[in-house]
Design a protein with these regions (language model features):
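Residues forming the flavin
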Residues: 1-326
């Protein structure tokens, strides 16, 4: 069994399969295991690696799966010495790996989407999840006066952690109502959009407007703008097999279509956002693999796509008079 991705779903799938005595390889393109768990301040990737290896799982970090071919063959690139300042000359810089698996579990995750609005590409603009990784993985607070603009629930934990780290945080949410508890120090503006960033080499302020009134603007002084326009499952590896992604209207993203080969997609790559549901999907995915291989026969049922408390709102761009959308 080959597992691609070491986030919550991939790890759960690998452990479940290893517990059933399957020969498991887990590959991860990052130098550390954990996927989006690396953005959790209490997470220990070295402990996770020890747990996986103690279960007999072969772990290959710094290894990117770049293609899925006929008969569940996967092409992967392992970066052997790129990260070493003075590498052993007997070692290659990189290795090309051909992995022939009987079943593939894709736990490749999802990418946070940006939102198009005026002057949104100057230094100081990044996705909300990137700022959370900087804070908890690298110990870097990316701004002192931060505005987060969103249409979904995923930014709220980030906002709380940035506030606890000492930043002043303001949230602009395009939705009308949400049911999330926030510290009173965090300002929340509902039905509010980012209109234009002011500044050239750095952010000086952000002009904002209401969803139903873009002619009247307010200005918020800030030094950083974080953006989350939703999440897109990473489905390109199943697309290599000619499997067309399917639009999911409730979650505003493409999810993998029906797969008839020995490939199972789990976690946020399947459009599942809640961490506990991702773990469950990994366990279910491993059981599906064992069913397919004739090792075991269990009733399986994947968690539903989605998982946020409040529905996402469609927001891809904010039109302005300066740059009207065609």
């Amino acid at each position: 069994l080959l597992v691609v991705g070491s986030g919550p779903a991939g790890v759960a799938a690998a452990k479940e399969a290893a517990n059933q005595n399957l020969n498991v390889i887990l590959i991860e393109q990052d130098s550390l295991l954990g996927g989006n768990n690396l953005a959790d301040k209490e997470f220990d990737p070295s402990l996770l690696q020890k747990q996986l290896e103690s279960n007999g799982i072969r772990v290959m970090s710094r290894t990117t799966a770049f293609g899925v071919y006929d008969n569940t063959v996967v092409g992967a690139l392992e970066r052997v010495t790129d990260h070493i300042s003075n590498p052993n000359t007997s070692l290659p810089r990189q290795r090309f790996r051909t992995i022939r698996a009987k079943h593939i579990i894709l736990a490749s995750g999802a990418l946070e989407r940006h939102i198009a609005f005026n002057n949104n590409d100057i230094p100081g603009v990044m996705t909300a999840n990137a700022a959370r990784h900087y804070l908890n993985r690298y110990g870097v607070l990316t701004g002192k006066n931060i505005v987060i603009t969103t249409n979904n629930d995923s930014v709220y934990q980030t906002a709380i952690e940035l506030h606890e780290a000492g930043s002043k945080v303001t949230i602009l949410d395009s939705r009308k109502d949400i049911n999330i508890n926030l510290p009173k120090e965090i300002e929340l503006h509902l039905e509010t959009l980012p209109l234009s960033i002011n500044g050239s080499k750095k952010i000086e302020s952000l002009d904002v407007c209401k969803v139903n009134d873009k002619t009247h603007k307010n200005t918020i002084i800030c030094d950083q703008v974080l953006v989350s326009g939703g999440w897109s499952p990473i489905v390109h590896l199943v697309s290599h097999r000619g499997i067309k992604p399917v639009w999911n209207e409730d979650n505003l993203c493409f999810v993998p279509g029906d797969i008839k080969e020995n490939i199972t997609v789990v976690g946020s790559a399947r459009g599942i956002w809640n961490t506990d549901d991702c773990v469950e999907s990994g366990i279910v995915g491993a059981n599906e693999a064992m069913n397919t291989l004739g090792i075991d026969k269990k009733e399986i049922s994947f968690p539903s796509v989605g998982g946020w408390s409040n529905p996402i709102n469609a927001l891809y761009e904010v039109k302005s008079n300066k740059f009207p959308s065609k």
